């Protein structure tokens, strides 16, 4: 737990340096469930709210084993088209669709015990 707090502290310190002008709003969006239509709408609303509030950056905290490829692709596209920097923080897992979403971010940070990968599309009959 101590290492986790240390990593968050350095991540916040980095963003404080990065957004050093008068407006220091940094949004955090947590994706901790299966990637699907609900998480897609949640991310889209969070990015829109961050933009409306003139946030300087968004931290996307990921802990997911994946989900549907269509929603992961939509989320990745929204991140790539975001007018503000989006950084992924892999809190524990970013597998499958979670990895695809993390790769779309401007930068990726991971907790030392976190894992990311297995970003393979699975065809189901």
Language-model features: locations:
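Bacterial N-terminal signal peptides that target proteins for export
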Residues: 1-8
